[in-house]
A protein has these predicted regions:
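Residues forming the flavin
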Residues: 1-278
Length: 278
């Protein structure tokens, strides 16, 4: 297996990874490699077509793809070696990486390793919603990918569970595309997204927000036909009061993120029992 020595290896080509790689090169590291398993740099930015990115770095409001393109250009201008379509299979405690691409496997020995793998969305199984398992249950990021990158409309009558920022933004996006967002249900007594997104994405479009409320059952066989909502008592203390059935064809989940920490574990990095991250 071919072996390569570098000063800094950055795993993950999203915004954090690009910033880390460019900063390492600017700070004097001569051999910096940026490893990304996808076919382009930018990570989640590539599907975030709303603006508001780049105000601090570039001094103007950019869409996610614009921000990713400009930062990728900055990375390449600093002479960082970018390995796309390349997966990191293992990271040892002595900073030795095993990577794989269509060109085969190789080993990279690094003076320093920067972990920028990001996170993934919590799926339905992680929150244990009872009911059947029909089509029509999506995480907000998947809905964003389908609509913004693939031009696929996921449904017409949508209930959103969770008030994370991506969920709020996609509730607005779905409404703009002609769907009916029946409500956003949040199990906590407050929203988890930014206040400005609540105003701009829900209030401005007349989308109801139900706090201390969650989905307690999903209905449908082949496709979602509806969900049952129920109020939750203080501190999540069980269902309080009656339940409400809403007929819908889609349930969109925006219920938090899980760190991509498998490589961190392999490298022997200590992880928080609360967040699952370093």
């Amino acid at each position: 297996m071919r072996t390569e020595d570098v000063d800094v290896a950055v795993i993950g080509g999203g915004p954090a990874g690009m910033a880390a790689a460019a900063s390492a090169r600017t700070a004097g590291a001569e051999r910096v490699v940026l490893i990304e398993r996808g076919d382009r740099l930018g990570g989640i930015l590539n599907q975030c077509i709303h603006d508001g990115f780049g105000t601090k770095v570039f001094g103007e409001a950019l869409t996610g793809p614009e921000y990713a393109q400009l930062y990728a250009r900055r990375v390449r201008e600093t002479d960082v070696s970018c390995l796309l379509d390349t997966a990191v299979l293992d990271v040892s405690s002595n900073r030795e990486l095993t990577v794989c691409s269509e060109k085969g496997m190789r080993r990279i020995r690094a003076g320093a390793v920067v972990l920028c793998m990001g996170c993934r969305e919590r799926p339905r199984g992680a929150i244990r919603i009872p009911g059947t398992r029909p089509a029509g249950v999506f995480t907000a990021g998947v809905v964003q990918d389908y609509m913004n990158l693939r031009n696929i409309m996921v449904g017409r009558r949508i209930v959103v569970l969770g008030s994370g920022d991506i969920g709020l933004i996609m509730a607005r996006r779905l409404t703009l595309e002609g769907a009916k967002v029946l409500c956003v249900a949040e199990i906590l007594p407050y929203t988890s997204g930014l206040a400005r997104n609540v105003v701009q994405c829900l209030d401005d479009f007349g989308i109801p927000l139900h706090l201390s409320t969650t989905v307690v059952k999903i209905h449908g066989t082949e496709r979602v036909t509806g969900v049952t909502l129920a109020r939750i008592g203080p501190k999540g203390g069980g269902v309080r009061g009656g339940s409400t059935y809403l007929a819908c064809d889609t349930l969109m989940l925006s219920v938090g993120l899980i760190p991509e920490n498998e490589l961190s574990k392999r490298a022997g990095v200590g992880l928080s029992p609360v967040t699952g991250g370093p």
